[in-house]
Amino acid sequence: MRFFRTTPRVLPSHPSEAEAIADLYQRAWQGCEQLLDLRLVRDMQPSMGEVRSWLQGGFELYRVEHGGHVVGAIRCTFPASACVLDRLAVDPAVRGQGLGRLLLEHAVSRARRTASGRIWAQVSPKLPAAVALHRDLGFRTVGQHLAAYWGEPLLLLELPL
């Protein structure tokens, strides 16, 4: 008898999954208060209602499930011939297994299908794994600014398509 490991797939999220996705963001950002400004961490931990509003209001949100649980997510929006990627999160219990890369690659592929001219992302330089992941996929730093509402410096990353 052979046992097969399931291959994770990226799927579009639905409003009925808002609670599971909000729980993922809570887990993914828990403990980051020691590294990042608390305002940034709290903003990255949306409520179920906020996630539901994303799904009903023009954002595309993709998820990865493992063992019946949402373990990764990324959000996309498409303003004026560009794509903005944000809210990339992976459950700490499954980090290091390529799920962040899988989600980011999916989002880049989605942007290509919309004929977006470029993709933008903002990443904290205090999250070197996130910065490295974006750079591995071809993103380059085109600016840095201090997000006053979060009290954190952020890198503006761009991937021309």
Regions found by a protein language model. Name each.
Residues 95, 121-130, 147-152:
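Conserved beta-strand-loop-alpha-helix junction that forms the acyl-donor binding cleft
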Residues 49-63, 84:
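A short helix-loop-beta-strand connector motif used in the catalytic cores of GNAT acetyltransferases and
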Residues 25, 134, 139:
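Conserved active-site tyrosine of GNAT-family acetyltransferases
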Residues 111-122:
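Conserved GNAT acetyl-CoA-binding A-motif
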Residues 63, 69-77, 84-89:
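Conserved beta-strand in the GNAT
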Residues 90, 96-109, 132-136:
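Conserved acetyl-CoA-binding loop-helix of GNAT-fold acetyltransferases
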Residues 6-23:
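A short beta-loop-alpha structural element at the N-terminal edge
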Residues 26-51:
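Conserved GNAT-fold acetyl-CoA-binding loop/helix
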